[in-house]
A protein has these predicted regions:
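Residue-level detection of the helix-turn-helix DNA-binding "recognition helix"
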Residues: 11, 25, 36, 66
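DNA major-groove recognition helix of helix-turn-helix/homeodomain DNA-binding modules
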Residues: 45-60
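Recognition helix of helix-turn-helix/homeodomain-like DNA-binding domains
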Residues: 26-41
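The alpha-helix within a helix-turn-helix
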Residues: 10, 21, 51
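Key DNA-contact positions within bacterial/archaeal DNA-binding proteins
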Residues: 18, 29, 59
Length: 67
C-alpha cells in the first residue's frame, strides 16, 4: 500500500485544497484524490509539482507500507 501524506503536509501549513491547486497549477480534483488517499493513479508531474511546492523529497509525500 502506498500512503500519501498530503493531508498532513497541508494541515501543518494550514493550506486548503484550493490554495495548493492555485499555487501549483494542478487540477483541484487531483489534489482532492491525493488528500483523501483515494487516488488510484497519479501523474509523475503532479508528484514533482507537489514535492517542489512543499520543498520535500518524494519520500516525505509518499510512503510504501506492507500493511
Amino acid at each position: 500500500v502506498i500512503k500519501c501524506h498530503l493531508s498532513r503536509l497541508m494541515g501543518e501549513r494550514k493550506l486548503k485544497i484550493s490554495d495548493v491547486a492555485r499555487d501549483t497549477g494542478l487540477h483541484r480534483n487531483t489534489i482532492t484524490l491525493l488528500y483523501q488517499e483515494t487516488a488510484t493513479r497519479v501523474d509523475l508531474d503532479a508528484i514533482d509539482q507537489l514535492c517542489r511546492y512543499f520543498q520535500i523529497p518524494v519520500g516525505e509525500l509518499l510512503e510504501f507500507s506492507d500493511s
